[in-house]
Design a protein with these regions (language model features):
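Transmembrane-helix motifs of polytopic, lipid-linked glycan transferases
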Residues: 135-159, 196-200
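Membrane-interface alpha helices of multi-pass inner-membrane proteins
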Residues: 50, 167-172, 212-232, 240-247, ...
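Transmembrane-helix signature of polytopic, membrane-embedded enzymes
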Residues: 148-175, 191-192, 211-213
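Interfacial juxtamembrane loops and adjacent helix segments
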Residues: 55-120, 127-128, 288-331
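Signature aromatic-anchored transmembrane alpha helix within multi-pass, membrane-resident enzymes
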Residues: 9-20, 215, 219-223, 240, ...
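Hydrophobic, aromatic-rich transmembrane alpha-helices
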Residues: 243-247, 340, 348-374, 381, ...
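Perimembrane helix-loop-helix junctions
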Residues: 199-208, 237-272, 360-373
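Membrane-lumen/periplasm interface segments of specific transmembrane helices
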Residues: 255-361, 378-391, 444-452
Length: 628
């Protein structure tokens, strides 16, 4: 029987080996800076740290690190987070509080330290040492190979190989995961930590006779989650709770307590390592800056000092209190729940659809939904999501523009372990179909999707989903060039525009053109609330334009070369110190300027030119009423 069972798994095993070999060969054969289109998001910090660990055996940033980085990328480490070090001394006293931590500035002014978690860079360093930047991609391939093997082994213990392989591949291929696979950042590292940890913890629940059905596997899982907590505190720290609570529900009090202690000790050890290197336990705390354009040590005469370079950034410890005590919390939370689930850029349904299938299959299973370990796993994932929305209401997706929810991505693999036992391949096929509707274009070329994330939402089903207005300034369109995001409207400094597609253009001296080719979505970000907009519109051709500002659409027929004036009611969302509205425009007809005037070399498909003025509630109350 053992031989027959092994033969059943031979096909998936061979396929997995082929995929890992092919992906590994690709990782080692590309020109990393060119193929990945240069730097993205927070890559510069992690890459520079990995290079420093690999070639210098330290985690300090000095002039030689800048020279090495510039030699590889032919540019500086744009967006790198660095901090000045501290010399820390721990003093023990005979009176409370007994222990005192004393810090003073690092006397060596020729070195700085990295302002991000260093675990990923440390583990990736051996691969970088032997394979250069390609080693980072190879590291990701091997991590994904381990994750895929754990996912398949867990599922195959409850279902036939074909069904297990279909679901496992859907979880990895029909989600946003392939894009994060080419980001030179810790996302795949954190993903694998959670996958392996939960496999070690839960495999004994589905295969009680296996060699992994031992108490040490739970402790090993706690070690990994402790490491993950250091690397990504939220949501990983929340994922430790089910390990402790499951033991306590079974009256294994000491085992649960020790599991929690191990996770805390491991996380504390890595924060301690951070303190030993830089003098700060918090890698995001202290005297920390980010750098663009010019960098420390980039002048040979020593003039490129810390004080003359970069802009300060801090972790605001007061933010959680302010967020939780705000009177706007209920309304903001309700909007964020909607965006978290079905948001156009970061939504759970479009970018983690296999997880939706896993939850649905679990809830529909009369037996699996009563399993305490599945209930605890779902509870932890749910709690992590709620925590992100409440504590990080403006940046719960991770910021920086990557597609999908970068923070929740760490918790995503835990959803795999909700999948109930069964024999059908239908859930896996459904996961592939539903996920592919939104992520197929990401899978075709993840390098393009990673560098230009705003392109993936300009066409396809994602265009039907709501825009995350609470995080207008963190949307991928901020990365678009030529500039389409954070564009000032004409001469009004209180109004900024974010053109989410290529069916409208930034304002020109005479107004803003919308396309004749289709609907355009534009975020209007204002420093004040808007009651309605006063519009003027004109076009050289007859057309019908439809305009909405988060409320009732207004349709206006334009006659050639005649200006139409009208008002559009507004309804928006309160953002981070601003008010955000989604302006939707569409023109029924279009024209090409060159074909009307041959001397005009403008080949755009234009529909109408708009000018608008926002009207505040105070102005409206003074007698400027909306038209009936």
């Amino acid at each position: 029987m053992t031989t027959a069972r092994t033969a059943n798994h031979l096909g998936p095993a061979v396929l997995a080996c082929v995929l890992v070999v092919v992906a590994g060969a690709l990782a080692l054969s590309i020109d990393v800076p060119r193929t990945t289109y240069g730097l993205k998001s927070d890559e510069s910090t992690y890459v520079a740290a990995a290079l420093s660990a690999a070639y210098d055996g330290d985690l300090a940033f000095e002039r030689k690190d800048l020279e090495r980085f510039a030699g590889l990328y032919h540019s500086g480490p744009e967006g790198i987070f660095l901090k000045r070090g501290k010399v820390m001394r721990i003093r023990v006293r005979g009176e409370f509080p007994f222990v005192r931590i004393v810090k003073r500035d690092d006397p060596d002014r020729t070195r700085l330290y990295f302002g991000k978690a260093i675990a990923y860079s440390i583990f990736a360093a051996p691969f970088v040492r032997f394979f250069g930047l390609n080693g980072l991609l190879l590291f990701h391939v091997l991590l994904l190979g381990v994750s895929g093997s754990c996912a398949y082994a867990f599922l195959a213990a409850q279902r036939p190989p074909a069904s297990a392989a279909t679901i496992a591949t859907a979880f990895m291929g029909a989600s946003v995961l392939p894009v994060y696979g080419v980001f030179l950042m810790p996302e795949i590292f954190n993903f694998t930590i959670v996958t392996v940890a939960y496999f070690l913890w839960l495999y004994k629940e589905v295969a009680p006779q296996s060699r992994l059905a031992r108490p040490w596997t739970t402790i090993a899982a706690a070690v990994l989650l402790g490491l993950g907590t250091y690397s990504k505190p939220l949501p990983t720290a929340v994922l430790v709770a089910p390990l402790v609570l499951l033991a306590w529900t079974r009256r294994r009090w000491m085992q649960g307590f020790m599991t929690g202690v191990v996770a805390v000790v491991v996380a504390g050890a890595f924060f301690g390592l951070n303190a030993a290197i830089s003098g700060e336990f918090n890698y995001q705390g202290g005297d920390r800056k980010t750098f663009y354009g010019s960098f420390p040590f980039d002048a040979p005469d020593g003039s490129a000092t810390w004080e003359r370079r970069g802009g300060s950034v801090t972790t605001d410890a007061s933010t959680p209190q302010e967020v939780l005590s705000s009177s706007e919390l209920p309304a903001r939370f309700a909007h964020n729940v909607e965006y978290f689930l079905v948001g156009r850029h970061f939504g759970f349904v479009p970018y983690f659809f296999p997880g939706v299938v896993a939850i649905a299959a679990w809830l529909l299973s009369s037996t699996a939904r009563r399993d305490s370990w599945r209930l605890l796993t779902f509870g932890a994932i749910f709690s992590a999501a709620i925590g992100l929305l409440i504590l990080l209401p403006w940046t719960w997706s991770g910021g920086g523009g990557p597609p999908g929810n970068r923070y929740f991505f760490t918790a995503y693999p835990a959803l795999l372990f909700l999948v109930p036992p069964g024999i059908s391949v239908a859930p896996g096929i459904l996961a592939w179909i539903g996920g592919a509707l939104f992520t197929a274009k990401l899978l075709v070329n993840p390098f393009v999707a990673a560098k230009f994330p705003y392109l993936s939402v300009e066409k396809g089903p994602a265009r039907r989903l709501p825009v995350e207005l609470t995080m207008a300034n963190d949307l991928p369109v901020r990365l678009a060039q030529p500039l389409r995001g954070h564009v000032q409207y004409r001469t009004d400094p209180g109004v900024l525009l974010y053109h989410l597609d290529q069916n409208s253009w930034p304002p020109e001296p005479n107004g803003m053109w919308i396309s004749g080719a289709g609907r355009s979505d534009i975020i209007v970000r204002a420093a004040f609330p808007i009651q309605y907009m006063q519009f003027e519109a004109e076009s050289p051709v007859s057309t019908v334009i439809t305009i909405a500002l988060g409320s009732t659409p207004v349709r206006v027929t334009l006659e050639p070369r005649k200006t139409a004036s009208f008002n559009v009611p507004a309804s928006g969302v309160r953002g981070f110190g601003d008010y955000n509205y989604l302006l939707t425009t569409q023109s029924s007809e279009g024209f090409v300027p060159h074909l009307l005037e041959p001397a005009n070399m403008d080949y755009r498909n234009l529909g109408a030119q708009l000018r608008f003025r926002p009207v505040t509630p105070a102005e409206a109350s003074e007698g400027k009423a909306l038209p009936k």
